[in-house]
Amino acid sequence: MKLAIMTKPTFFVEEDKILATLFEAGLDNLHLYKPNSSPIYSERLLSLLPEKFYDKITVHGHFYLKEEYRLAGIHLDDNSETVPNGYKGRISGTCRNIDDLRMMKKKYSYVFLGNIFNSISLPTATSCFTMNDLEAAAKEGLIDKKVY
């Protein structure tokens, strides 16, 4: 089982130290998720982390950071995002229905299911899947080690 963590959407004091500690403790995959933020702040956070962890970091948005810091890959948060022209590397994505899951599993290295539950912090972000949806997808073999 791989340990994957998504950052808080906002930056906070000593975030770099906490992330470095998580990597030292065995974190396999960090998703750098800082929507609506200037890329300079993500660059600053990355520059504070030891380079040996860069190949375990997947970036949401600001896709140029993948090449600049030799990160693990990019993540597409929704269907409106596209893979940058000429991009070669690991791609993951978030799907919000079973049809998207079928399609994304064929194209991406791995997929997040979002949202499984109603969000506590974002009241408008409600669950996208019912228990029946998830059980049917599991029976169909759609939910496996490539689905988080």
Kindly give the residue locations of the regions a language model identified.
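Active-site/ligand-binding-proximal alpha/beta "capping" segment
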Residues: 109-148
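Conserved N-terminal beta1-alpha1 strand-loop-helix module at the mouth
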Residues: 1-75, 79-109, 144-145
